[in-house]
């Protein structure tokens, strides 16, 4: 069975959580692993009308059969980790989760610096989660590791070994990335970026998967891209236009209102190429065309929505495999059999 990586193609908040949740329940992976930066990115999913938001644990937590892992490349905030164990106790995550013993730790001093540093918080618009300062300490070889935190001891494991053993045995492994291509330290709108690379190749490395063991990369795009914080946004629309279109969103972690723009085909093509996308997922199609809300059959999509999907495929050069038409898990069109 393959390994599958899901990453964001814009500036984060693309709806990766809803795509991951669907894959977790529909494909039933044996392992769901989280790569990416750390607790500065939140993923939200709706289950039976209830919203769940996670910043540390894998978003596929609702798949009760899966082992949940946090890769060595991810920063761990013990406070957030234990809060989410409690918050998600109905899903029995405590008995299924493992943290790589090499994860670097976010300490209170990192969060304080992130919140008070005029450049980071003022100009760049960081989330205040401490990820940037913690990654800086990691690069300087000063950061603590998960193995140094006594409270984390019951959850420590070698994530890379677990995942590669599972792949050897034919298991399906789903890997989640965080944030989006435009926030990559290497390829994003520097300096208005996150503190590491978040493309698919780096996310694979975060959890210990070599490039030859990656089978599929799904890059997620939202019909109207959004951005939280400062930085270039070439297709940004005026706030008044966003209000008129009903495109009012707030960040999962920061609570700040998101800036909204029109779909950027040029950025999407570049993002898909650098990430090595084998397929695309398009979310919030119902925001682009309200008549598409709740549709689960591609043939029943209204003409406007279909033409948008076809234009994306043509201009980006990658087939669309999944389409979200609403907030609930079942509001999805799965076209992967046609690819």
From Swiss-Prot:
Pathway given in the UniProt record: Purine metabolism; AMP biosynthesis via de novo pathway; AMP from IMP: step 1/2
Q: Which InterPro entries match?
A: Adenylosuccin_syn_GTP-bd, Adenylosuccinate_synth_dom1, Adenylosuccinate_synth_dom2, Adenylosuccinate_synth_dom3, Adenylosuccinate_synthetase, P-loop_NTPase
What PROSITE patterns does the record point to?
Answer: ADENYLOSUCCIN_SYN_1
GO biological process terms on file? 'de novo' AMP biosynthetic process; IMP metabolic process
Per UniProt, the cofactor note for this protein states: Binds 1 Mg(2+) ion per subunit.
Q: Which Pfam families match?
A: Adenylsucc_synt
Residues binding Mg(2+): 13, 42
Q: Quote a single Gene Ontology cellular component term.
A: cytoplasm
- Sequence positions that bind IMP: 13-16, 40-43, 127, 141, 179, 194, 256
Q: Which residues form the active site?
A: 13 (proton acceptor), 43 (proton donor)
Give the NCBIfam families listed for this entry. PRK04293.1 (NF003295)
Complexes and interactors:
Homodimer.
**Family from the record:** Belongs to the adenylosuccinate synthetase family.
Q: What is this protein called?
A: Adenylosuccinate synthetase
Specify the species.
Answer: Pyrococcus abyssi (strain GE5 / Orsay)
GN (gene name)? purA
């Amino acid at each position: 069975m393959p390994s599958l990586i899901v990453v964001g193609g814009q500036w984060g908040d693309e709806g990766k959580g809803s795509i991951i949740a669907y894959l977790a329940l529909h494909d039933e992976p044996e392992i769901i692993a989280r790569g990416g930066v750390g607790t500065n990115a939140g993923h939200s999913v709706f289950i039976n009308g209830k919203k769940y938001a996670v910043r540390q644990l894998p978003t596929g937590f609702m798949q009760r059969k899966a082992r949940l892992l946090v890769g060595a490349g991810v920063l761990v905030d013990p406070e957030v980790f234990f809060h989410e164990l409690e918050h998600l106790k109905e899903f029995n995550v405590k008995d299924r989760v493992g943290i790589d013993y090499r994860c670097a730790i976010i300490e209170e001093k990192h969060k304080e610096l992130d919140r008070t540093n005029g450049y980071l918080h003022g100009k760049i618009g960081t989330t205040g989660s401490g990820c940037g300062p913690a990654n800086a300490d990691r690069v300087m070889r000063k950061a603590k590791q998960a193995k140094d935190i006594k409270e984390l001891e019951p959850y420590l494991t070698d994530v890379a070994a677990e995942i590669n053993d599972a792949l050897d045995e034919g298991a399906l492994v789903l890997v989640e990335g965080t944030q989006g291509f435009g926030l990559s330290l290497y390829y994003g709108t520097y300096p208005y970026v996150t503190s590491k690379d978040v493309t698919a190749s780096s996310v694979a490395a975060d959890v210990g998967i070599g490039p030859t063991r990656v089978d599929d990369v799904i890059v997620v795009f939202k019909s109207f891209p959004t951005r939280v914080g400062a930085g270039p946004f070439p297709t940004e629309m005026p706030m008044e236009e966003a209000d008129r279109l009903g495109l009012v969103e707030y960040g999962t972690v920061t609570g700040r209102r998101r800036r909204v723009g029109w779909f950027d085909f040029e950025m999407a093509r570049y993002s898909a190429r650098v990430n090595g996308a084998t397929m695309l997922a398009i979310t919030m199609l119902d925001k682009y065309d309200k008549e598409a809300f709740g549709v689960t059959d591609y043939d029943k999509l209204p003409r406007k929505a279909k033409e948008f999907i076809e234009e994306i495929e043509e201009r980006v050069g990658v087939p669309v495999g999944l389409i979200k038409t609403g907030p609930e898990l079942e509001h999805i069109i799965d076209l992967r059999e046609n690819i």
